[in-house]
Amino acid sequence: MSPLPDLASVVRTIPDYPKPGVMFRDITTLLGNPQAFRRTVDELVQPWAGAKIDKVAGIEARGFIVGGAVAHQLSAGFVPIRKKGKLPHQTVRMAYALEYGQDEMEMHVDAVHPGERVILVDDLIATGGTAEGAVKLLRQIGAQVEAACFIVDLPDLGGAEKLRAMGVPVRTIMSFSGH
């Protein structure tokens, strides 16, 4: 068996994508490496091993992949947070800020019950607009947001600090400077 890789070295960096000056952090290489993916999930769930977490909420789309694995490890339910218009049942909706403008996300109104302990999961946190919207959405229906977990943090963009200012503990596995 080969040794476990340094997780940050498994993430592919694509310069100037999706626009010039951006260094895109592509986690598909990490997801495709069984050892790295397992280690990533293990590290994300470690602080809550043995804790009572009711649900894991994942943000569309890569948050579904990581969040599903985290929910499985914690024996918790999984809740998808999707772009508006993608869920078939009655939903609750929240607007959130994008770099240029805003959008809306939603979840099923009965996906989380008041007082349930929820961990929010996504692949990456940059400016924090989407994660902030997801936290507000979860709180709107009465969830107790225990933490937000991300594989990658881009600390220069301030998203993790934005969530901490909302009283949400943030767990990340790696960080990259720049955009």
UniProtKB/Swiss-Prot annotation:
The coding gene here is apt
UniProt xrefs under Gene3D superfamilies? 3.40.50.2020
Q: Which family does it belong to?
A: Belongs to the purine/pyrimidine phosphoribosyltransferase family.
Per its record, the protein catalyses:
AMP + diphosphate = 5-phospho-alpha-D-ribose 1-diphosphate + adenine
Q: Which GO terms describe its molecular function?
A: adenine binding; adenine phosphoribosyltransferase activity; AMP binding
**Free-text function comment from the UniProt entry:** Catalyzes a salvage reaction resulting in the formation of AMP, that is energically less costly than de novo synthesis.
This chain's protein is named Adenine phosphoribosyltransferase
CDD domains given in the database record? PRTases_typeI
Write out the annotated subcellular location.
Cytoplasm
In its UniProt entry, the species of origin is given as: Azorhizobium caulinodans (strain ATCC 43989 / DSM 5975 / JCM 20966 / LMG 6465 / NBRC 14845 / NCIMB 13405 / ORS 571)
